[in-house]
């Protein structure tokens, strides 16, 4: 029987980000998903080019009953932090209209 420090259910954007964060902290991670391939929805977003973030992310663009939650969440992990992560992994991307960020290569 294997031992895992962290078990994550779901290989979508949040599950993969959570697994990467745990891995950076030297945790052994198991990600379980019902789909045969991880990140299925991410890979098809943006016509297969993966619209992975937006540089114009601001609290005023969100409709929410608790606007303080949005401010808090966005301040804890701003767009440029994810862009830094993408760049560290050598992924080429471009900025399109309205600040949308897309990978340059089609997802496989």
Residue map of PLM features:
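N-terminal Rossmann-like FAD-binding beta1-loop-alpha1 element of flavoenzymes
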Residues: 4-31
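Short glycine- and Lys/Arg-enriched binding-loop motifs that mark or flank ligand-binding interfaces
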Residues: 6-11, 42-44, 95
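Conserved active-site and cofactor/substrate-binding residues in soluble primary-metabolism enzymes
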Residues: 17, 37, 77, 81
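Short, contiguous strand/loop micro-motifs
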Residues: 5-6, 68-72
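Gly/Ser/Thr-rich helix-start
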Residues: 11-16, 47-49, 91, 100
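Glycine-rich phosphate/pyrophosphate-binding loop regions near the starts of catalytic domains
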Residues: 62-64, 73-78
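Conserved N-terminal glycine-rich FAD pyrophosphate-binding loop of Rossmann-like flavoproteins
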Residues: 21, 35-68
